[in-house]
Amino acid sequence: MFRLIQSIPSPKAEPFKLWMAQTAKERLDEMQDPELTIQRSMMEYKALGYSDNWINQRLKSIEIRKELTDEWKRCGLEEGAQFATLTDIIYQTWADKTTKEYKRFKGLKKENLRDNMTNKELVLNMLAELSTKEISETNNPESFNEHVDVARRGGSIARDARIRLEEETGQAVISPLNAKEVLRLEQNKDKSNKEQ
């Protein structure tokens, strides 16, 4: 593709060629040093207005999710329908909502659900996914039904923590707030803190 675009002699194509060359260089650099990918992700989240605390939580959640999907691959599960089904079971167990219901609750359409979770939701989702991975490594499930059971057990650990936190604080953990609303609230909070 790059060679094809390079062969276009138009001066109007020059800025696009330069952009493509820069992007290709960045991706090749990231392949050599994966930390650059993390830094780029942090800068992109920062540009969208996310707080440093939320960004750190989100990057950790990406790492934990990858560990879980690596475990599922090790067990012979296939990406796509099986991963989606198990993810739905984990969400349904700890949050009482499937992925689709959770996204609807937050007013999302195509946006990434995890990018629209609050810190508490991210932490509990990480607990559910980490617990599922640990139980899977310990029990070595073989059939898909055994994986379903493991996903429920992992989600139950986070569900118990969610219920306990809600009892202690008197506040619901599952929030209808999406990223735009959370960012707006954080900005208003920062303004009021500066005024004091």
Give short role names for the model-derived ranges.
Residues 1, 6-196:
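Positively charged, phosphate-engaging catalytic surfaces used for nucleic-acid and nucleotide handling
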